[in-house]
Design a protein with these regions (language model features):
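Conserved C-terminal "switch" segment of AAA+ ATPases
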Residues: 18-21, 104-110, 116, 122-170, ...
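Post-Walker A helix-loop "phosphate-sensing" segment adjacent to the P-loop in P-loop NTPases
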Residues: 12-24
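Conserved RecA-like P-loop NTPase ATPase core
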Residues: 8, 29, 46, 61, ...
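Conserved P-loop NTPase "ATPase switch" module shared by AAA+ and STAND
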Residues: 29-30, 53-72
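C-terminal helical "lid" subdomain and adjoining coupling/linker elements of P-loop NTPases
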Residues: 148, 163-216
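Short glycine-rich substrate-engagement loop in P-loop NTPases that contacts/grips substrate
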Residues: 24-53
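Single conserved hydrophobic/aromatic residue that forms the stacking wall/gate
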Residues: 1-11
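Canonical AAA+ ATPase core
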Residues: 64-71, 80-126, 131, 143-144, ...
């Protein structure tokens, strides 16, 4: 989302301004960008990502997913071990930022003795407001070439105002917005599948009835 991206770029620019990094570029990944399914592949993939981020900022979103896997077939820990070594080897020209929900990130930091010593500066971002989540929804619609009707937009505002106020279990900020839009698009597809005359405007327009009743 645009708001989160602005925060990342601001942090990057500050490190660049004080000379902590030489290039100032941003490399953003999540678990899928680091972990592979076979022994040895994860270390190699993670090392390549680290190499690509040298001189800049490596941003790892939902970093806790690297250490909360179950069973011996999970290679997230291999990525963490490689990351820690890379941070030590390149500590003079690499900034690594890990992000995620507070409680899960605490578990992540507790999973390896080396993590807390290396990740010892914390920034707590407030949850998105309802209006920010609606803005993210509108932007995501544009990216996927959808539009919200006036009534649909009002329904979205009602939904996110209530959800942000109550913050039910599983509340997930921008991920809620993505899931909400996916369900709205699915509902719209079901609604128009039986229509005889469907033009581009109908295909692109999400109506209030496509949003009413969505549960996350």
């Amino acid at each position: 989302p645009r708001v989160r991206r602005q925060r990342q770029m601001c942090i990057r620019d500050r490190y660049k301004a004080i000379g902590a990094i030489s290039k100032g570029h941003l490399v953003e990944v999540d678990r899928s960008g680091l972990v592979c399914g076979y022994i040895g592949q994860t270390a190699s993939k993670t090392a390549e990502v680290i190499e690509s981020a040298l001189g800049g900022v490596l941003f790892i979103d939902e970093a806790y997913t690297l250490t909360n896997g179950k069973g011996q077939g999970d290679f997230g820990q291999e990525a963490v071990d490689t990351l820690l070594k890379g941070m030590e080897d390149h500590r003079d020209d690499l900034v690594v930022i890990v992000a995620g929900y507070t409680e899960l990130m605490e578990e992540f930091l507790d999973s390896n003795p080396g993590l807390r010593s290396r990740f010892n500066k914390f920034i707590n971002f407030e949850d998105y407001t309802a209006e920010e989540e609606v803005e993210i929804l509108i932007n995501n619609c544009k990216k996927q070439e959808y539009m919200l009707s006036r009534d649909a937009l009002e329904e979205a505002r009602r939904f996110f105002t209530e959800r942000v106020a109550n913050k039910p279990e599983g509340y997930a900020n921008a991920r809620d917005v993505r899931n909400y839009l996916e369900k709205a698009i699915s509902n719209q597809a079901s609604r128009i599948v039986g229509l005889k005359d469907v033009d581009k405007n109908i295909l692109a327009m999400l109506e209030k009835e496509d949003l009413v009743g969505i549960e996350l």
